[in-house]
Amino acid sequence: MTKTELLGVYRTSANHIRLTYASLVLWAYPDTTDFFEELYSRMDSIPKPFVDLPTLLRDDRAMRVACEELYESAHRSALNGLFPLTKLYCQETGQLDKLKAQPWFQFWRILRNCFAHDMRFNFNRDEKSLLPVSWSGVTIDISMNGKPLTNGQCSREKLRELFESAQSFITNDVA
């Protein structure tokens, strides 16, 4: 993978988060559900695999939960997918030590493992030896072992900051 290709994956991930946000803004508008149902009913040429979709769209509580999860999953997906690609690129270009020296590297690594394994912290021996790890005012420590990650522990704003820090590192600090 080239640096240009890796930065392309970062851009695609950022666009995924942005598009998800734009979708949530649209769903927050009171008339969006009516507009969607009218448009959807006229679109005969597209598959409609979710017959219960209008019911979901009219259920305020279910929509709130679904929208929150959609936004969360866009952030998790970006950070979960980019970590191994970033690490692989740095390893293949002889810059892994530079990556590991970043103040957010171990934090991201442990957070990514949480994302990839049921959204719970299940620290392995190596991770336990590194704890506590802190980055940007957020600390992951041994007391979190076996517990789920919550938005209160690491907000979407912090996830975006982590994403932007890693993207800036690839853009500016590696060859």
Regions found by a protein language model. Name each.
Residues 3-33, 71-91, 130-175:
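Amphipathic, Lys/Arg-enriched alpha-helical patches that create a basic surface
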Residues 29-99, 103:
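Short, contiguous, well-structured surface segments enriched in hydrophobic/aromatic residues
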Residues 36-39, 53, 111, 159-166:
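Generic structural signal of hydrophobic/aromatic residues within well-ordered alpha-helices
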Residues 37, 42-44, 48, 122-135, ...:
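Peripheral peptide segments
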Residues 102-125:
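Histidine-centered, metal-coordinating catalytic motifs and their short helical/loop contexts
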